[in-house]
A protein has these predicted regions:
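Alpha-helical multi-pass membrane helix bundles of inner-membrane/thylakoid proteins
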Residues: 2-5, 76-77, 88-127, 168-186, ...
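Juxtamembrane transmembrane-helix termini in multi-pass membrane transport proteins
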Residues: 3-73, 128-147
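Juxtamembrane boundary at the C-terminal end of a transmembrane helix
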Residues: 8, 193-200
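Hydrophobic/aromatic residues within the transmembrane alpha-helices of Major Facilitator Superfamily
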Residues: 17, 21, 55, 91, ...
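Membrane helix-loop-helix hairpins that form the core translocation module of multi-pass transporters
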Residues: 40-110, 165, 172, 193
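Hydrophobic alpha-helical transmembrane segments of multi-pass membrane transport proteins
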Residues: 144-167
Length: 200
């Protein structure tokens, strides 16, 4: 590692942490899943979120190393698909019915993977971290991969904070189920709107 890269790592770490800890589709879904049905189903979904995060990071690194035109061509479709999925999750939270999860949406490993790979914010965040803080200072693929895969590790750890935060909010949720569902659904809908706004 070059001295310039070492000097850039604290800013990279701060950027990654801030992006990972703030509300987004994965963090909001994890919080809502924990509040609604408990930590065990949320942890099952978290495994999928983590797998999806690593997949997205691998795609970001591949795009930055040469497949950029392929990724750029797929971004609009991925954005629309991701926004549609997040809107569907929001609707699932507030529609009538008492299903498990989000009224029938099961918090599975597969659901976690789908949420992450359609989360274009995640692809943009991952790419930005590499472009701003790593690629200007090294062309070593091993260093790029090592630092790049730190992003999903930090992101997954931050997602766990949202899951365990939900544990402490379960009693509150049980007393205020409808308003909390409405607020969480609105937050997810805002995430979807933000995703679509990036297309304009």
């Amino acid at each position: 590692m070059t001295p310039a890269l070492v000097a850039a790592l604290p800013a990279f770490a701060l950027y990654t942490f801030i992006q990972a800890i703030t509300p987004g589709p994965a963090n909001l879904c994890s919080l809502a899943t924990t509040m609604r049905i408990g930590v065990r189903p949320a942890l099952r979904q978290w495994v999928g979120l983590t797998i999806g995060f690593f997949v997205v990071m691998a795609v970001a690194m591949a795009a930055l190393l040469g497949a950029t035109s392929l990724i750029e061509g797929a971004l609009p479709a991925l954005t629309v698909a991701g926004a549609a999925y997040v809107l569907w999750l929001a609707w699932s939270m507030v529609r009538p019915g008492e299903g498990q999860g989000f009224n029938g949406v099961q918090p599975t490993i597969g659901a976690g993977v789908v949420l992450q790979v359609t989360n274009v914010k995640l692809l943009v965040m991952s790419s930005t971290a590499l472009v701003a803080y790593v690629i200007p200072y090294t062309s070593d693929l091993a260093v790029l991969a090592a630092i790049g895969f730190a992003v999903p590790i930090v992101g997954s750890a931050c997602n766990l904070a949202w899951i365990y935060g939900g544990v402490h909010l379960q009693a509150f949720y049980e007393r205020h189920r409808r308003p909390v569902d409405a607020i969480m659904a609105a937050a997810l809908a805002l995430c979807a709107v933000g995703m679509l706004a990036a297309l304009v």
